Amino acid sequence: MIKFINILSNVISEQKRYKLSPEDYTKLLELTDRLWALRSRKIPRKIEVDQMEFKTADGSDAKVRVFLNPRYKNYAQMDLKPRTTRNPQKFVMQLNPKLFGSKKNLFLTLYHEFMHGTDPNFTTRANEKYWKDYDPTVDEKYWGHPVEFRAVTNEFLEGLVNEFKRRNQRVNNVEKRQTLLMSLKNILNYFAKGEPLTRLSLDIINRISDEGLKDTRIANLLADISTDYPETSEFMNNKEPYYLKLINTIKKFNSDMWPRFLKMLYDTVEEINNIINKGT
């Protein structure tokens, strides 16, 4: 049985990955489509391009205004405006369209920010004690804080599910589905037992965000060779993927909360197992 530390009492206590409602998930996909369509448009200054209503994890009504800002130094950030407010209707998010990279990366970045937006610790449950140890300029107080643990782990697990779904839809025989299941088990054992990752598992984690993949038809066709023919992954570059570095950073600064991630991962693996075994 997993023993949770006291600090987790300040976090929504779901033991599985947090999922947006089907309605909010659809809205997020649509928002991703609209923002992706703007990636090549010349935007000289910060402009408001969208709004989205959603629900927080405690059921409160929330809304975010979405801005594109080509001068913003980071990829994206969701915050409350004014910062002193705790009204979930007052979220503002800005993104730098020059940093979008891939469409998968854009979606998962938005997903990460909405994990913050749905977290009542930003709004209806905000308190000084919870935030006093949070400092984005200090690794231990940023990566080691429960608010980033929640956002990063849910972002990764959502991406993992989506990547296995995508690959499962492209395979056409039982043998290839068994290969996917073996990689899924390998990824679980890597995080739980330190088992080395196979080349295919590395490729799967790398494709979660299409890290470094150029936005061209040829680049996507070449990248999908290992998707359609998993055995070719043995010839792929085995550099450490971004999400592997990210989750290992979370582990480094959240050793007490790490068992919670493993429980979330185990449940997610079961979810993916069911998807693959159904062949859909």
Question: Each PLM stretch: what is its role?
Answer:
Residues 16-19, 23-27, 270-280:
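N-terminal low-structure segments adjacent to metalloprotease catalytic domains
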Residues 25-60, 114:
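Zn2+-dependent metallopeptidase catalytic core
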Residues 65-104, 114-121:
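Active-site scaffold of zinc-dependent metalloenzymes
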Residues 109, 114, 123-127, 164:
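Catalytic phosphate/metal-binding cores of nucleic-acid and nucleotide-processing enzymes, i.e., regions
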